[in-house]
A protein has these predicted regions:
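Short helix-capping/linker segments at secondary-structure and domain boundaries
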Residues: 50-62, 312-317
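Noncatalytic regulatory segments and standalone regulatory/sensor domains
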Residues: 177-298
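C-terminal alpha-helical interaction appendages
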Residues: 1-29
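Short, charged/polar micro-motifs that form catalytic or ligand-binding hotspots
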Residues: 34-35, 97, 162, 290-297, ...
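Accessory carbohydrate-recognition regions in carbohydrate-active enzymes
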Residues: 67-69
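Conserved active-site-adjacent core of cysteine acyl-enzyme catalytic domains
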Residues: 35-54, 72-222
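Charged, long alpha-helical assembly modules
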Residues: 291-446
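N-terminal membrane-targeting/anchoring modules of bacterial envelope and secretion proteins
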Residues: 12-16, 27-32, 39, 49-57
Length: 446
């Protein structure tokens, strides 16, 4: 947990930002409960907003539900990944795009709708990144992006490499010597060696060494307009609006869920669920399905209960009591999503029930921040998930050419690839390089 001198650093940093006296600044920080977060980006932003003194529409501290709703709220997407030599896997998203912290759009949107300013910074090397992080942490808490799988409290569904470099955000509260104090979703803060933190931050490509701080004093919109805009964005996304273009766009929104339903009940004759995931792969796919709905920092029920809390707050802000009825509907919908997740690994099939219990044990240990339990469970996964890869020729190892030379030959698109620009997706082309790049792009959860 955070040591006394670390807490004093936070108090003095708040004094410098707000002009408060020591007792007032300390009281404000001490009042902040050791809350258990639900969603990493929402929880991290709530922490930064509290430290910056940014209030919600009612004058109190913004809730995590309010941040989720203002950031864009709900969404939906379904993807099946099949490659020769690899076990097929399934992914379902239930929040607005992108559900994971591939960029800062969700955080920036929510903060600006609350009238806060976001200051983003990146670095070109680990040494420069550490200097920038230390300088920012000296003034207050900092949000940073890193690879979730590198953290000692990250739960495991299967082998570490199965998740790839899953982007994640934490709040760095203090740096003492060679140890950083991090706040994630557990009630207590974690202390992590700076070398581990640097490795986790360097693992990402587009978000490499990215940090973000929040400050008060932005152009605060009318809270009612902000809430209306946020709800409209959520409605559009559920309707299928997507930044993704091409054939993959049909997998988003309610149309994407309809395609999944057709695959499950066999109406999709081309690729029914039982053909994509035969008995040898069924446990693997069903375990991932439950993980994405219940355990992937959704708060359970695919974010629907948390969004219902936002709708209750929106009803008060907009003075529209009818939204409370919609909130009740979303709580019922969340219960239905949880029921679907439970049906994926039911009690009456003993091996599936064992997988579900193992998932819950790991998840509970991670939520408690019980590192001892996490160490015992590290890299352990259930025999039912040890599925043989799908038959087929193993992917050919592609020949590589120097990235900088490729970028020079590729013009603007090559430069975009070289620097990990947003929106790049490898094109299909004859030869192994493009196919292998596309395979790596899709095998990591979107």
């Amino acid at each position: 947990m955070t040591k006394d001198h670390d807490f004093k650093k936070l108090v003095r940093a708040r004094m410098a930002r707000t002009g408060e006296r020591y007792a007032a600044a300390r009281a404000q920080l001490a009042r902040k409960p050791a809350a258990v977060g639900v969603h990493p980006e929402s929880a991290a932003l709530v922490s930064l907003l509290a430290a910056a003194g940014v209030a919600g529409p009612g004058g109190g501290a913004p809730s995590e539900a309010l941040v989720l709703g203002l950031g864009g709220g709900l969404g939906a997407a379904c993807f099946t990944f099949e490659y020769a030599g690899h076990t097929p896997t399934f992914y379902v998203a239930t929040r607005c795009q992108p559900q994971y912290a591939y960029d800062e759009r969700f955080v920036r949107t929510a903060a600006e709708r609350l009238g806060a300013r976001c200051e983003l910074a990146t670095a070109s090397s680990a040494a420069v990144a550490h200097k920038k992080l230390a300088a920012r942490v000296a003034l207050g808490p900092v949000m940073t992006w890193l690879s979730f799988g590198e953290l000692p409290w990250a739960p495991r569904l299967g082998p570490v490499g199965e998740l790839g470099a899953m982007p994640h955000v934490v709040v760095v509260e203090a740096i003492t010597g060679d140890v950083a104090t991090l706040r994630d979703l557990a009630p207590a803060a974690f202390e992590v060696e700076l070398a581990v933190l640097a490795r986790a931050r360097a693992r990402l490509r587009a978000a490499r060494f990215r940090t973000l701080v929040v400050a008060a004093g932005g152009d605060a919109p009318d809270p009612r307009d902000a809430v209306r805009d946020a709800i409209a964005a959520c409605v559009a996304e559920l309707g299928g609006a997507s930044r993704v273009r091409g054939p993959m766009a049909k997998n988003f929104g309610l149309p994407g869920l309809a395609r999944w339903a057709a695959a499950l009940d066999g109406r999709d004759k081309k690729k029914p669920w039982t053909r994509v995931f035969p008995p040898a792969h069924a446990a693997h796919a069903l375990a991932w399905t439950r993980h994405w709905i219940e355990l992937a920092s959704t708060g359970g029920g695919g974010f629907r209960p948390l969004y219902a809390d936002f709708l209750d707050e929106a009803a008060a802000i907009l003075r529209r009591p009818a939204l409370r009825s919609v909130a009740r509907d979303y709580r019922a919908l969340g219960a239905a999503w949880s029921g679907l997740a439970t049906a994926a690994l039911p009690d009456h099939i003993a091996p599936f029930a064992a997988v579900r219990r193992a998932q819950d044990t790991r998840h509970a240990a991670s939520r408690r921040g019980d590192l001892a339990a996490m160490r015992r469970l590290r890299d352990a996964f259930d025999p039912e998930l040890r599925c043989a890869p799908r038959r087929g020729r193993a992917p050919r190892r592609p020949r590589r050419r120097p990235r900088r030379a490729a970028a020079r030959r590729g013009g603007a698109r090559g430069a975009l690839r070289l620097f990990g620009g947003a929106g790049h997706r490898p094109r299909r082309r004859r030869g192994g390089v493009r196919r292998a790049a596309r395979r790596r792009y899709l095998m990591s959860p979107p």
